[in-house]
């Protein structure tokens, strides 16, 4: 499976499940005496049971959605803890505000099995209102075939899930990339699709809605 859109808080996850996952993640880190930034991944079954997948000893691509709903700079936290400082806040001191969504802008062709598309960015225009854009690419830069083809992360925050989704859609419409094939239109189709808007999600989304991969 491929990560396409990330969001926080996770839709369909109860507060009880969220607390249980958090406690399990803490126990996993404590069991090996781990100190530092880390990301524990779980897979949620339809019956509400969850299963450990993996732990990455770092922040992950999707950390901005957590930053936007908590108002915290996790990169700064990571560096402070690595320098021997305690965590700035305890778990019960971390605020949760609204919802956030992130898409990964890739130089790839979704209709051809997400085949990477190397080339030179002849135009790269990123949105500036109501979204956050994390990127290291500018016009004239080359997307190499030797590395991951992600060119940017576009993230939106809103008072609720639908507002965040709509802001992200607006941001995608304002983005312009030329010189490479990209997944922006595909991302917009997914965000605007009925199952995604209704948060009717599982790992079979594209399998059940293959039309989202098709170019209109």
Predicted feature locations:
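ATP-dependent carboxylate activation and anion-phosphoryl transfer catalytic cores
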Residues: 1-216
């Amino acid at each position: 499976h491929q990560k396409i859109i990330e969001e926080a808080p996770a839709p369909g996850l109860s507060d009880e499940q969220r607390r249980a996952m958090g406690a399990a993640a803490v126990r996993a880190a404590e069991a090996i005496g781990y100190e530092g930034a880390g990301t524990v991944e779980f897979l949620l079954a339809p019956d509400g049971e969850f299963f450990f997948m993996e732990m990455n000893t770092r922040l992950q691509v999707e950390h901005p959605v957590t930053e936007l709903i908590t108002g915290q700079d996790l990169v700064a936290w990571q560096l402070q803890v690595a320098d021997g400082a305690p965590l700035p806040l305890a778990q019960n001191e971390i605020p949760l505000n609204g919802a956030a969504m992130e898409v990964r802008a890739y130089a790839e062709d979704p209709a051809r099995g997400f085949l990477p598309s190397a080339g030179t960015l002849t135009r790269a225009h990123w949105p500036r209102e109501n979204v956050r854009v994390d990127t290291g690419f500018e016009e004239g830069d080359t997307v190499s075939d030797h590395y991951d083809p992600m060119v940017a992360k576009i993230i939106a925050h809103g008072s609720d899930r639908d507002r965040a989704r709509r802001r992200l859609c607006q941001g995608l419409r304002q983005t312009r990339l030329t010189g490479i094939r990209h997944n922006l239109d595909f991302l917009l189709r997914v965000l605007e699709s009925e199952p995604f808007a209704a948060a009717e999600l599982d790992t079979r989304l594209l399998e059940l809605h293959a039309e989202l991969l098709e170019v209109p």
